[in-house]
Amino acid sequence: MTPSLFERAETFRDRTAIIAPEGVFTYGNLLDVSATVATRLLAGRDDLEETRVCFLVPPSWEHIVTQWGILRAGGLAVPMAISHPSTELDYVLGDAEPEALVAHPKLLDRINIAADRRAIPVLQTPALVADGPVGELPTLLPARPAIMLYTSGTTGRPKG
C-alpha cells in the first residue's frame, strides 16, 4: 500500500518543507498546525464526512496547513482561486455549497457578501492556524475524496 501524504510527511518531520517570508517550516510544523486546524474545523465532531469546506488563501504556508487541516478533519477541500473576480468566487460558493469558508483577512472583502447571503460561516486564517489544542482526528481511507477543483472558467462559468 502506498503511504499517505501525511504518513510521508511524518517520515520527514524534521526536514524543511517550505521556505517563506514568514520563516522556514518543516513537515512537522505543517503536520502540527494542520492538526490544530482540523481540530478547530471538527468543533467536537468525529469526522467532517466529506463535508465541503471552501478556502480562499494566497499561496503560502497558511494555504498548505488550511488544505491539510480540511483533509485531516475528513472534509472535502475546495480551493478558490485568488485571481478570480468576486462574481466567480460567488458562483463557486453557490455551486460548491460548503459548510464553511476559510479566508485570509486580505481577501475577506471579496467574499464576505456572498458568504453572508448564504449564511456560510467564515473562519479567518490567523485564528485558525494559531496555536491550540489537538483532538482525535478521523482515520482516512485512501479511496476517500479529498479535493474538489474548479476550472478557471475561461470559456464560461468555473466547473467543479
Regions found by a protein language model. Give the residues of each.
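Conserved ATP-dependent adenylate/AMP-binding module captured primarily in the ANL superfamily
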Residues: H84-A114, A130-G132
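AMP-dependent adenylate-forming
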Residues: P3-T26, G44
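Active-site charged/polar residues at nucleotide-handling catalytic sites that mediate phosphoryl
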Residues: L48, D95-E97, R118
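Phosphate-coordination loops involved in phosphoryl transfer and adenosine-cofactor binding
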Residues: R15, E49-T51, P142
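Conserved AMP-binding/adenylate-forming
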Residues: G23, A38-H84
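Adenylate-forming
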Residues: R8, L30-S34, V53, I70, ...
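Short beta-strand elements of ligand-binding domains
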Residues: V57, M80-A81, A103-H104, A119-L128
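Conserved pre-ATP/AMP-binding loop-to-beta segment of ANL
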Residues: R13, P133-Y150, R157
